[in-house]
Regions:
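Protein kinase-like catalytic core scaffold
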Residues: 25, 69, 136-138, 162
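Hydrophobic residue at the +6 position relative to the catalytic HRD Asp in the kinase catalytic loop
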Residues: 122-129
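C-lobe/activation-segment region of protein kinase-like
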Residues: 138-207
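Conserved hydrophobic "DFG−1" position in protein kinase catalytic cores
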Residues: 17, 129-131
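Activation segment of protein kinase catalytic domains, centered on the conserved DFG
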Residues: 88-101
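Alpha-helical membrane-targeting segments
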Residues: 34-51, 88-90, 152, 178, ...
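Conserved ATP-binding subdomain of kinase catalytic cores across diverse folds
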Residues: 1-85, 104, 110-115, 119
């Protein structure tokens, strides 16, 4: 957890003054939405961010775009899926919510691979998701990604899908995982090549976990 001097307080948030590398920063830490005690963060990472937090940082960015003096945002974001999994967040048990998230992850992954790009570390921790009834997934943190071709691309695609499944196999049902794969391929049912690829995905991390 971020530590610093508390300079402001409300029923749902705290503002901390933090010094790092000789520079002073202010971090707004959300404690909840007023109805529960689930901790949420603004400026750093936390659990699923409430819509008011997202709106707040977007407004600050708009103010700066319009030339209105405001604090410079040096960090803002939502939470990665892996934290939700390790915290056993109830969102993961909401099948409708998860269906929306998985559909977006499938679309993101398909778009990357269709362009010949492999993420190379496509794990849940590199996917941010906001809250609300209509969640939005954001892809972050891709220092190892790059363009590939031929058999090299095919291998990297298997790796990307295996990275996603590394947590999914413990958090999702078999039907959810199958639905994700079908959304990724844009198909209604599995073909022979799909079954071969799935076997490679499942075997990718065998003996390495």
């Amino acid at each position: 957890a971020t530590k610093g001097e508390q300079v402001a307080k409300s029923p749902v948030s705290r503002v901390l003054r933090v010094t790092a590398d000789g520079k002073r920063y202010y971090v707004k830490r959300y404690l909840g939405n007023g109805k529960n005690a689930v901790r949420r963060w603004f400026g750093l990472r936390g659990l699923v961010a409430p819509q008011r937090v997202v709106k707040e940082w977007k407004n600050l960015l708009l103010f700066r775009k319009w030339g209105i003096p405001t604090a410079t945002l040096v960090g803002y974001g939502l939470e990665h899926l892996e934290r939700l999994a390790t915290a056993s967040d109830p969102c993961l048990r909401d099948r409708r919510w998860m269906a929306q998230v998985l559909r977006q992850v499938a679309n993101i992954t398909r778009t990357l691979h269709a362009a010949g790009f492999a993420h190379n570390d496509l794990k849940w921790r590199n996917l941010l998701v906001d809250g609300g009834g209509s969640p939005t997934v954001y892809l972050i943190d891709c220092p190892s990604g790059g363009m590939w071709w031929g058999v090299f691309l095919k291998y990297r695609i298997i790796k990307d899908l295996a990275c996603l499944d590394k947590v999914a196999k413990y958090q999702l049902s078999r039907s959810q995982r199958l639905r994700f794969y079908l959304d990724y391929t844009g198909q209604r049912r599995l073909g022979v090549e799909d079954k071969q690829r799935i076997r490679k995905i499942l075997a990718f991390f065998e003996g390495r976990e």
